[in-house]
Amino acid sequence: MREIIDGKLVARGLLDRLRVSVDRLKAEHGIVPHLVVVIVGDDPASKLYVGNKQRKAEELGLQSRTIALEHDTSQEELLRIIDELNRDAAVHGILVQLPLPRHIDKELVINAISPEKDVDGFHNANAGKLATGQLDCMIPCTPQGCIHLIKTVKQDLAGSNAVVVGRSNIVGKPVALLLLYENCTVTVLHSASRNLEEHCLRADIIVAAVGKARFIRASWIKPGAIVVDVGINLVEESGKKRFVGDVEFEGLQDVPCSVTPVPGGVGPMTIAFLLVNTVLGSCKQCGVSYEDIKSSLLQ
């Protein structure tokens, strides 16, 4: 029978441990990790995501602030705000909520954030460090969450065949690298790949991040596989709208595999690791040893 990997439950445990670390930082060092989220425009989904992030941060005792800017805010003004936040020693994490309006250069904005405050892990400096195995950098939140969920099922991933479906800079590429550093044999599938079913059927681990509803068929997944579904797609069925993943979740009912649901799988882990990055970033910026905190969080 299918086993559900409950991302909400796993994230709750991670955040409980993180709360202990935050309390220690306050008591022993007088440090209150401080996250600032910048949102441009009034996209409803972005507002919802930002609200969730701020609420979770405050629940953990972090200082959290949102800077909400009008849709027509100039790129120059946004860059000026980021520069101020970079120079503010009391701010440990900066996140610019995506997507941005079309008149703003996303890459320019992301790379204007100080790498040590880039809690999304999207800055070119952090991407370069990750690509070369320097894992003391800010690592993107969703890929970290994927690995953590996989390890709730199987701790030692060495020698596992892993398939990543999707090659985005946000999920596909970084999660493939993290799996490689776990000594997996990694195959990345994309729009030009052939024989997708054949590759997936050989996989011990599948990470689906392609952004297409139910793209990965249940018949492509072998018994015993671990499946992490990063996709979140809004579909309309029988006159009702709901979110589904990139994996044919319903078809796995009788397949003996481990799979994350959508929603309630990867999403909570992404927010959890955003807060982890903020806390670890505060330690680094304040010269506080963080290895014991990191090991306690990722147990």
From Swiss-Prot:
SUPFAM superfamilies: Aminoacid dehydrogenase-like, N-terminal domain, NAD(P)-binding Rossmann-fold domains. Pathway: One-carbon metabolism; tetrahydrofolate interconversion. Its EC number is 1.5.1.5, 3.5.4.9. It holds the Pfam family THF_DHG_CYH. One of its GO terms (molecular function) is methenyltetrahydrofolate cyclohydrolase activity. Keywords: Amino-acid biosynthesis, Histidine biosynthesis, Hydrolase, Methionine biosynthesis, Multifunctional enzyme, NADP, One-carbon metabolism, Oxidoreductase, Purine biosynthesis. Gene3D superfamilies: Leucine Dehydrogenase, chain A, domain 1, NAD(P)-binding Rossmann-like Domain. InterPro entries: Aminoacid_DH-like_N_sf, NAD(P)-bd_dom_sf, THF_DH/CycHdrlase, THF_DH/CycHdrlase_cat_dom, THF_DH/CycHdrlase_CS, THF_DH/CycHdrlase_NAD-bd_dom. It comes from the Bacteria. Signal peptide: none annotated. GO terms for cellular component: cytosol. It catalyses: (6R)-5,10-methylene-5,6,7,8-tetrahydrofolate + NADP(+) = (6R)-5,10-methenyltetrahydrofolate + NADPH; (6R)-5,10-methenyltetrahydrofolate + H2O = (6R)-10-formyltetrahydrofolate + H(+). Catalyzes the oxidation of 5,10-methylenetetrahydrofolate to 5,10-methenyltetrahydrofolate and then the hydrolysis of 5,10-methenyltetrahydrofolate to 10-formyltetrahydrofolate. Belongs to the tetrahydrofolate dehydrogenase/cyclohydrolase family. Homodimer. NCBIfam families: PRK14188.1. This is Bifunctional protein FolD.
